[in-house]
């Protein structure tokens, strides 16, 4: 099982006034690394257009540092801040 946590920066001035580094966090679990990588490398809107999106656990605004504790790898891709944790069980 692969768990992916992906954060997209929020440019909305309303959220920027509330928190310094707001992001939309999307968390999802996958059965294979190939499926996980497809999600990691996709734009959220494009991904949801191709899939029904019902299996996404949560989309919420939160502070960047709140997800930082479990980050294994942090990379920039296509304008997104992507945080993902690969974990097998």
Name these PLM-found stretches.
Residues 1-6, 27-29, 57-62:
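Ser/Thr- (and often Asn-) enriched beta-sheet segments in non-cytosolic proteins
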Residues 37, 41-89:
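Short, mixed-charge low-complexity intrinsically disordered segments
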Residues 7-10, 31, 75-76, 89:
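Secondary-structure transition/turn motif
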Residues 20-38:
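A short, exposed loop/beta-hairpin motif centered on an aromatic-Gly-Thr core
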Residues 12, 32, 54-55:
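Intrinsically disordered, low-complexity coil/linker segments enriched for acidic/polar
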Residues 1-25, 82-85:
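Short aromatic-glycine-(Arg/Gly/Cys) micro-motifs in beta-strand/loop hairpins
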